Structure formats: C-alpha cells, structure tokens
Amino acid sequence: ILSPGISLNKNKNLQKYKKKIITDLDLFYLDRKKFKSIVVTGTNGKSTTCKLLDHVLKKNKFKCLMGGNIGKPLLSLNKVNNSFVIIEASSFQLSHSKFIHPNYAILLNITNDHLDWHVNMKNYINSKFKIFENQDKNQFAIVNRNFKYLFKRKKLTGKLKVPNLKQYVKLKPKLKNNYLKLNMNDENLSFVYELTKLLKIRK
C-alpha cells in the first residue's frame, strides 16, 4: 500500500512495481459490504462540501460516515450495509488508485496546484479523473460546468451531471446561515444541491 505522500512520477525505483501498488482507497473499496460512496475531489472546497453533505444526509436520517482527508482515516471507518460514506480524496490518493468506483463522484474544480508532486498539469488532471474511471452506468459523475469539454476526450461510463449554478442562486435567499450565503460558497453548495436532487432530498 503506497503512502499518498510518495509520487511514482519522482521515484524511479518504485515505478517497476506500479502494477502491484495499491492505495488505502483501493483497500477500502475491496471491502464487500454494500455501502454507497460519495467521493469529492477538486483543488478547492473539498472539506466544505464534504461537511455540508454530511450535515444534509444526517439531517435527513441517512446512515452516514465521513473520512479520507477529513474526519477519520478511511480504513478505520466501520462501514455498515446501506450506509453512505463521504470521502474527501486528494490528487495524491487518487493518482495511483485502481479500484475506486464511487456511486457519486464529484469534481469541484481544478486549478494549478501540487505540480511539484505531479510534475505537470496533465498528470494532475488525470489523477482527479481517476474517480470516474471505474464507474458503471448506474453511477453518477457530477462535474464543474467548466470541465464538460474534457469528457469529449475521455471515456465516461457514469451518468454526467452538471450543477446548475443559476438554479441554486435562486434558492440562496432561503439560507439562514450568513456564512453560507457568501458568494465564495456558491459553487460548493450548487454541488450539494445537485446531489440532493439525485437522492430525492427535499429539506
């Protein structure tokens, strides 16, 4: 199991073992329990989005766990059947993952970052897109509207959903939390809103 801090792009000695290397995310998904997963990645906004999703799901009586880069380490979570697991996934974790297949894969945004680890932007983008690679036709890929064009070049099996920011903004006045009303939260909340529609949550 490879530590997320180690980059194969910079370690030639490990590259020959690339096919055998797995990550904590892979091990988590090899568990046979029937849980549903929501994986959130992006350069910015991951933690905020995960916390909001956790709050909304629990408020609506869903069994819910949260881990990864937020909350508890993934492998310490006690998964139960029919529970939701919210995972904050970094590009480091995703880069070498092979078996991850989220029911709901969320890509918030991508900006220039972590290039010291990934070496170039292409590697960074490819690591983020790992969350979509193993999805099936019954799973959902929820993607920032600015990255729709990338899917013309990449095969996507999951159902593509693009949050409607304008639709969310119309609902914004109903928010009671003044912090969440700040414009910087609009993007994150539009993704939360999109997922609540898929889960048929109305509160």
List where the protein language model places each region.
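Phosphate-binding loop of NTP-binding sites
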Residues: P4-A141, R145, Y149-L156
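Adenine nucleotide phosphate-binding catalytic loops in nucleotide-utilizing enzymes
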Residues: H118-I125, F129, K155-K203
